[in-house]
Amino acid sequence: MFGGSINEGTIDDVVAEARQAEADGFASYWAPNIFGHDALTALAIVGREVPRIELGTSVVPTYPRHPSAIAQQCLTVSAACGGRLTLGIGLSHKVVIENMLGMSYAKPVRHIRDYLSILGPLSRNEPVSYRGEDYSTNLALNAKGAPPFGIVVAALGPQMLKATAELADGTLTWCTGPNTLADFTVPTINAAAEAAGRPAPRVIAALPVCVTSDTEAAKGRAAKVFEIYGSLPSYRAMLDREGAAGAEDIAIIGSQDEVVDRILALAAIGVTDFAAVEFPGNPDEAVATREAIKQAMS
């Protein structure tokens, strides 16, 4: 389940949303890290209040945070939530990193390889000595009682998927449709993991979901709500690969049975986890959408 309260609500709202996701039987609760509350800090609080569900970030931008700093923070969060943390990280976008933050977005694949080469050992509380082009570290952390945390990467292109397969636990996709997942994402990351002698990676697919009797209205709403993603190059490439004009063309929209069937079909193409991004148009659609997701996940 993909949470929205972290950007639109209070920390109490985030806790309540995660608690409801756990009560509804979902395996994971994913908190985005955009311009609202800090996802990792929020999940440390959630982890003390909500006892069982996996807690993940989707995703924390890498460029503003040194890998050793985020490793220390994540070990602390992992200790707070009893080892249920999965860190989702991503490059963010050139417009954010360069225009908003004034940092270089050059050579993103080199950046993520250096980043993961440092973050991986530290995530297991192991010392790391690494010299790369973007990052160099000689460090050991001492977070007593902190369980290791998982790492997934918002990897979309082939080189990012290869780096992720070799150095992380899986990918978390967005704006990536079922045909692209089946024909490109899943086989690319699985082949790279096999070639590297790594375990089969997680493929976590996040997609918009709405149960409705008015499909056209829901598509129109999705086009507005998710409009920005079509203008960001990494997502635009995935939409183009799918032959989609925008997120509305890959959103899971329809009757309850249709939505359940489309979610279940993702598992058949190699998606290991599904993260629903609900966008109901009214309270009845909200209830029906949640029920369909629960049915598909049961």
Give residue ranges: language-model regions:
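Active-site-adjacent structural elements that line small-molecule/cofactor binding pockets in enzymes
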Residues: 1-298
